[in-house]
Amino acid sequence: QMVCGDGVEYLRAMEPAQLIYIDPARRDEHGARTYAIEDCTPDALALRDLLLAKARYVMIKLSPMLDWRKAVDDFAGTVAEVHIVSTGNECKELLLVLDGKAAGATSAVAAADTRAPHVYCVNDDQRLDYDAAAYTRGLRIGDAPLPHELRYLDEPNASIMKAGCFDVVEARFGAVQIGPSSHLFV
């Protein structure tokens, strides 16, 4: 079924669904790019409760320029998954999956600190995923001593860089970050 009309009006009138996918326009009325969620059309933050009242899951495509942690905070405890998608080592998409059941949809603000999302970093055929709660509290970056024998210098792919999950890289791959202000590993 194809419906031509105002998407927000359709959202208000539609029957409940399992999933709603929303790709807000990231250009203003003058054609300039916008990055903040509330500057996009429609404003997914303003529609959060309505979206979650109409679907168990809501997938929102956002600007890859956004700080995903702030976006998660902005959606106040409703974000179950963060997908950072890159191709050719260039970050292309930031997708948030909201779960209405997890936050109760009516008391999302009360649930804000009760759960952290699962983060998926994808770059072509490379994938790294982790539970944000396990790795983003008290990040320690570049604390480990460097190994005596240095054979490789590694730079994470764009999705991992965007996620900022350098402690996950250290834990999963036995790599050591060369310094607190560096994103290079040995």
What positions do the PLM features span?
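S-adenosyl-L-methionine
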Residues: 1-21
